[in-house]
């Protein structure tokens, strides 16, 4: 008896994110097609497969996410899917963006059609294809990546940074805007300081 009431108590107090209704702004359409959440807006269309342990109810100007089971998995997915749905709605209205900086003497980047071309101190240029759904802009040594899908923007930004991670001695490489790279002393500098 106590265990049953404890389970109910846990499910009722679970997921502050999942419990909140999600506002659907004007000009945005949210629907469930087969087993997919489909969100359409001025910035495009996003789709995500809906897990069978989760239910999404769409009303006129709001949506809600609820778990269909009293399992640990469904409780975990409850907040996750609510966050995904919020991000999808935001993304089709206002694109997500990430900025990166290319640092280092002789290091540069240029936009060539649907590719980013980097000179990063290697014997060959590094070329990255810009994925569909992503927009890239280059201003001197700053790259701006934007798109409706928050995860896709983050993944592509991480791929760019991974082509030449900032090194800890001089800080050369590609870093996120505002990222602080903790610098190490070289052996000569450390010996001189001693």
Language-model segments: residues:
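N-terminal intrinsically disordered, cationic/polar leader segments
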Residues: 13-194
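N-terminal amphipathic/basic-hydrophobic helices that include classical n-h-c signal peptides
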Residues: 1-13
